[in-house]
Amino acid sequence: MNSKILVATHKQYLFPQNPLYTPIHVGKALTNTDFGYLGDDTKESISSKNRNFCELTALYWAWKNNYFKDVSYVGLVHYRRYFHGDQAFNGSTILSETQVSSFLKDHDVLVPKKRNYYIESVSTHYQNAHFKKDLVETQSIIQELSPEYADAFSSLMQQKSLHLFNMFVMSKENFNAYMSWLFMILFELEKRTDLSHYDPYQARLFGFMSERLFNVWLINNSLKTKEIKVENLEGENLLLKAYNLLKRKFLK
């Protein structure tokens, strides 16, 4: 095995019986339930912050505890969302290790196909769906702590599409570099944000913001990406997504 992909989950589910994929119980520190999966709550972890950091608690744990030390390529998917590929699984076909090795010969990062907002920018979409002040604060933090990323942030905000879900596969070296930068920004944002008045959905702030920051990191580092369709094992209601997009934009 030269690759390892973590599958973030918060519940018992069906997972590929393939050593490429390893389910990891995110937010395990917040529950007494043990599904028998790898947990994000041992050694150095932020498992207890899962309600705010979402699947990032798995990434932080893997990064800080050198989980990927024996492989060259690393990644993250979700219990119901995988990259499309040629490996049969649960009525779908998902990414195989052979494809990972092949695709990453000519690309730096495997990413989900972009979500296109069509009628609004990345910036206005975030402001309609979440809180503008958090986006403004994140931009300020980047200007203060990582000014070389400021132009990439501004560029992304003006675009009308981006990669979502915090799904990727990349080299271990790129992963370590990304984690170091990402958590520097997010932990500073955490220091400056009072979540006490956020409802459970909006309290997932750092998960939402990291989706934007992932794109900023890709842009700034001029990384060559390969877009891959996302297989949603539970299906996806695109009409409902379109309705909610319009509702947030015009009825907020």
Regions found by a protein language model. Give the residues of each.
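ER/Golgi luminal nucleotide-sugar-dependent glycosyltransferases, focusing on the catalytic module
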Residues: M1-K252
